[in-house]
Amino acid sequence: MKDLSVNLLLEFPEEHRVERVLWIDPGMRGLYAIDIRDANALPEFYQAEEIEKMRDAGEWRVVENDPWLLALADENISEVYRDKRDSAWETIRPLIFDQPAIFDAIARSEAVKRGMEESGVTKQTIYRFLRRYWQRCMNKIKTHIR
């Protein structure tokens, strides 16, 4: 697991799935990752032994070219999308830095409830914003780009 890093993409060819590493336990006990193509994906925890076993069996490989790793300057984004992006960012910003808790389903549910109360945004919208953030390089710029 020492050769893995946050934001790295892992392809599982047999399952036609690509997952982004969201967080790695400092004690190297495991990591959270999310499927970047699944519109309903949520972070999933993998034990270190499980990841290493799958790697040794050739079940996943590192993706060299990240489709979301492109530089976008603000001036190249329309004002409408910038406003939507900024609004989405302000909604999830208080939630995303509580790591690893935000990746846990129960803790995330509580955080989303607080986010709903503070922002007036629906649960579905907050989950959509979080998903986009996690799936698209964990970068503010790409939270609302299609």
Regions flagged by a language model, labelled:
Residues 1-146:
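Secondary-structure boundary/capping micro-motif
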